[in-house]
Amino acid sequence: MLVLNNFERIKIGLASPDQIRAWSHGEVKKPETINYRTLKPERDGLFCERIFGPTKDWECHCGKYKRVRYKGVVCDRCGVEVTRSKVRRERLGHIELAAPVSHIWYFKGIPSRMGLLLDMSPRSLEKVLYFVSYIVIDPGETPLLKKQLLTETEYREAREKYGNAFKAGMGAEAIKELLAEIDLDELSAELKAEIKESTGQRRIRALRRLEVVESFRKSGNRPEWMILDVIPVIPPELRPMVQLDGGRFATSDLNDLYRRVINRNNRLKRLLELGAPDIIVRNEKRMLQEAVDALIDNGRRGRPVTGPGNRPLKSLSDMLKGKQGRFRQNLLGKRVDYSGRSVIVVGPELKLHQCGLPKEMALELFKPFVMKKLVADGIAHNIKSAKRMVERVKPEVWDVLEEVIKEHPVLLNRAPTLHRLGIQAFEPVLVEGRAIQIHPLVCTAYNADFDGDQMAVHVPLSAEAQAEARLLMLSSHNILNPKDGKPVVVPTQDMVIGSYYLTVEKPGAKGEGKKFAHPEEVIMAYEEGVIELHTKIKVRYPIRGEIVELETTPGRIIFNEVIPEELRFINHLVDKKALGKIVTESYRKLGYEKTGYLLDGLKKLGFHYATKAGLTIGIVDITVPKEKQEILEEADRMVADIEVKYRRGLITEDERYQRVVDIWNAATEKVTKKLVETLEASQFNHVYMMAKSGARGNIQQIRQLAGMRGLMADPSGRIIDLPIKANFREGLTVLEYFISTHGARKGLADTALRTADSGYLTRRLVDVCQDVIVREEDCGTEDGIYVTDVKDGTDVIEKLEDRILGRVAAEDVVHPETGELLVAKNQEITEEIAEKIVSANIKKVKIRSVLTCRTRHGVCTRCYGRNLATNSIVDIGEAVGIIAAQSIGEPGTQLTMRTFHTGGVAGEDITQGLPRVEELFEARRPKGQAIITEIDGVVEVRDNKGRREIEVINQETGERKVYPITYQARIKVQTGDKVYAGDELTEGPINPHDLIKVKGIEGAQLYLLQEVQKVYRMQGVEINDKHIEVVIRQMLRKVKIEDSGDTDLLPGSLVDIFEFEDENAKVIAKGGKPATAKRVLLGITKASLATDSFLSAASFQETTRVLTEAAIKGKVDPLLGLKENVIIGKLIPAGTGMARYRNIMVQAKNEE
């Protein structure tokens, strides 16, 4: 495969004036743009054809040379080269400045790079640059100091006193001289010495200066290049000027900004030629400096330059920044052709891998293919007549379209694409009408419904793209959800209720207890009306070659007809969970092809019997339990009792509130329990059937319909202690209705906020993980992590079995009693092995983990284990980072925003839901954090003169630590308890940074993992550990240098672990002293910005800051991640984009 942009890495640096002149195709001398009469570009202006190239292909400005044959000729009259007009997108010009100006990025950024190099404060630097003060460049023999600032009067006095014995100046010229004088090597040596000697603020300042000096020294950039003598002018097509229909012109803001620079520059030139007084020239230079500032980064200093309507003009920096900037708008996401969108409707008769494509849409999308085929089949004589045929929609076109579309998959996508299942490939089937038809089973993956949702269609063009769509993206291949390995294509709603209805038993139905010799007899008896669908019968049934006698129902026999032979016989009530199990089982045993058939069978059967059952609900189905009244009266009595106690002052307001809430909660529970009993008695209650089968609705909703609504929360989230006693069947009173609107309104507001927060979290996660790719088979590490059940108090949140399944054992696991080898080291733990380990009562297993993987720039297959979407060990090249980010981000919207107010208990907020996940991943210091012990030992809790404290005493070493505790804090331990370093003494979240100090890296990793899991599990969302591990690994990949030893590393800087080890290895090999460092935990935003790739960081956040730093350091981007490669338009280095697939040619069979 020919790759045009086949380069290894990309470097950024400062441009020297000579470099800028070398890029340029000519100097822009005039501020004019185009001639208002001829509408042709003015010569030497911002759109000049002589500099930037012709506006029309192969045609010079004056029209002397027209046609391709003059290619490359430079016209002797107008000086325009005859060439393609698209060179106007790539040719730069330049402006020669009459006075140097500073580049605002380097003077104004934080920290000010210019200021650090010159050891001046940004304030004094600003005074010099904007012509407020003079600066002494060379004091000569005078008592003045170098870099001393002088006001106008002080300067005059000094001139009178010392004459020309000293040299001072103002503006960028003076700064340029100072910068040019700097000897970087000498300065670097001085600073290193100072760092060794000094302490405190001075050392920190020296460190920061050394960082900048080293950057310049290593990158080969010269400090004086931060001052501009010449400014590049970007190509005119990138700052276009277009005529609007009213004859007016719309132009890019950059043209205005360039015009101001050119105007001021030309005026300054004229003033200098005339020899104008100093003060006027100075003012003009200041204005030129401000104009250049506005061009580079408008609004960074002072008031932004505004256009018409007081709108700040968009400068070069703004062109890159933010969602609308170049990076995110045009480089990371582009609009594509061969795409369309339309409303979706359900297509129940489609197969799992098909979608219905409207005819006119298909014709438009596959137009070139149809035209080629028309010519090839001899229906049209040439491409032009073929095009005419397609445009006039001749009848023969449709037959050709049918052929073209066969075996050519299309991609369907629904926004928002929260995970990779939001884009899948289908085989198109032509349909009448203008709506896309979707298979009902893929709706869950897309989160689609048919209330007006729209979907986009894309056509993969090349043979390679088609092959990938068919082999990797076909919907029937994406049955399992990558986040937890559970099937995502499971029958829902009608299909569930159909299967449920079909497999229900009805005691005492017609013909109960009859015996049959063969399943076909049963069906016949049912069709003849001898027995019902739900009758209990006995039958001899052939299963895998042997005859078994079963007690079952005709419905279940019909249900088993769609089940593959290997999985029969399913002889129980089938609800949604059971369907999920059947699909999982089928996928594991029979692969996706047969599972596809099974799913289509279940779909057809479910719809059919849901229709036959005719399940309806009416107000009659909602039966209010008889006991409700008694329960309520009882509760009212208890509440009245408490009110009396409260009025007598026997209990506090808080206690009263808490008890009332508890009473009503208990009452609601009782009503619900009675309601369920009532419903279960009548097994065929339709409302209950829907909830029980998992088709729609849940017990909470039925409780509100037929039980009581219970307690509601007010806008702040506090529970109102006045319950809603009525249900929707009886109807609410006005007050009850009013109270319940609070909750509803808050719910809507929350959902809106949550969606945005969740999207932003996903974006940060993707950014931090995007370069985690499976790079090799085995990294050879001996490390691993020990896993046990994850518990919250005594409740098991995540079982050991789930945690070890599909992982690779890091050591042999042996049965504690029999000594039998259950799993060998480096062997995958399958379902069977996991079951054995649990049944052997082993509580702790050491597994390979991403957290301890030694692969650089990625992970290895052994440490990652099984790819959950395919149920087999992960392939090399899989972008597991992106999968992890999507798996954590996608359920984000389901997490509640609510900061729960535990009704009145010490009134403290526990952060939960999405904000808690964010707090963990951003490694923030949590609110109300727990106090943890730093040593192992025994606890003593005591009150000491009005303050509480906990002392931990280590019996072996005799070490003691005392922790003062506030009275608000809730203590978790008692005197005499044994604690270990890192255990909590009070309740609350732990600060992960403290945990690293006490328990080391591993402790912090496991804490973060368990805490994130807790939040998701509380909401009933299952996410596999390995996804969270990938993110935590990325948060911990940097070390902070403490002592640089003999290496080039700077103390206090953040360095990648592997880079740090490399540097040390080099130094040790030479017999030098290695550097020391400590691991740091970075939040995901910080970690994204600290990545090695400046392209990735710049496209994430703080674009200008990242680019400023990268340019000064002369950073090289090794293009290892996905984003960097997307930005420069290369194939991503994952999956089939890896080097090893580069030269494989895909050939379509049917063409030859």
Curated annotation (Swiss-Prot):
SUPFAM superfamilies: beta and beta-prime subunits of DNA dependent RNA-polymerase
Binding site for Zn(2+) 1: 60, 62, 75, 78
GO function terms (MF aspect): DNA binding; DNA-directed RNA polymerase activity; magnesium ion binding; zinc ion binding
Note on cofactor: Binds 1 Mg(2+) ion per subunit. Binds 2 Zn(2+) ions per subunit.
The UniProt record lists the keyword Metal-binding: yes
EC number in record: 2.7.7.6
Record keywords: DNA-directed RNA polymerase, Magnesium, Metal-binding, Nucleotidyltransferase, Transcription, Transferase, Zinc
Residues noted as binding Zn(2+) 2 in the record, renumbered to the chain: 779, 853, 860, 863
Enzyme class, first EC level, given as a word: transferase
Cofactor(s) of this protein: Mg(2+); Zn(2+)
Pfam families associated with the record: RNA_pol_Rpb1_1, RNA_pol_Rpb1_2, RNA_pol_Rpb1_3, RNA_pol_Rpb1_4, RNA_pol_Rpb1_5
UniProt-listed Gene3D superfamilies: 1.10.132.30, 1.10.150.390, 1.10.1790.20, 1.10.40.90, 2.40.40.20, 2.40.50.100, RNA polymerase II, clamp domain (4.10.860.120), RNA polymerase Rpb1, domain 3 (1.10.274.100)
Catalytic activity: RNA(n) + a ribonucleoside 5'-triphosphate = RNA(n+1) + diphosphate
InterPro entries noted in UniProt: DNA-dir_RpoC2_beta_pp, DNA-dir_RpoC_beta_prime, DNA-dir_RpoC_beta_prime_bact, RNA_pol_asu, RNA_pol_N, RNA_pol_Rpb1_1, RNA_pol_Rpb1_3, RNA_pol_Rpb1_3_sf
List of residues binding Mg(2+): 449, 451, 453
Family to which this protein belongs: Belongs to the RNA polymerase beta' chain family.
Function summary: DNA-dependent RNA polymerase catalyzes the transcription of DNA into RNA using the four ribonucleoside triphosphates as substrates.
Subunit architecture: The RNAP catalytic core consists of 2 alpha, 1 beta, 1 beta' and 1 omega subunit. When a sigma factor is associated with the core the holoenzyme is formed, which can initiate transcription.
Protein name: DNA-directed RNA polymerase subunit beta'
Source organism of this protein record: Carboxydothermus hydrogenoformans (strain ATCC BAA-161 / DSM 6008 / Z-2901)
Gene field: rpoC
